[in-house]
Amino acid sequence: VRDGLTFLDVIARQVLALRAQYAAPLPVIFMNSFRTHEETEAILAAYPDLPVRGLPLGFLQSAEPKLRVDDLSPVDWPANPELEWCPPGHGDVYLSLARTGLLDALRGMGIRYAFLSNADNLGATCDPDIAAWLLREQVPYLAEVCTRTVNDRKGGHLARRRSDGRIVLRDNAMVVPGEEP
């Protein structure tokens, strides 16, 4: 990112600063794909005070088979079977938290809310005032959104669900051709 630091270095330093400022454990856990997990662990090893007792610094999201565009059959790559798989995307965080037992571990520690952000969004940081508001108002979910620009072709977007009119976060993979935002 800058001065020899990675996104992970900056995040680790942000978390450690917040812990010091508020005298709170503030766990940080990274969801990785099978392709990024080892590199993430190697970078975070430089921060021995980062792990919170009883919680891992990272967990693996699921993997799903790559599909051919022409017939949607699984890709076959005998020379390197790892290339037959891909990470499913950000929406897998909820399923992977449950599948790995991490959701139960967090609940068992009394943790009720989670702050989720892409690692490359360094402007997003855990804000204690927002956490206090969530608790005080008993808000179950909060998302920070911004107006999309022409550069925001990737990623999810807000949509109104037809079945009940609720606003939902819709991943691009869920968009019917012709209904792109």
Regions found by a protein language model. Give the residues of each.
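Domain-scale recognition of functional cores that engage charged ligands
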Residues: 1-181
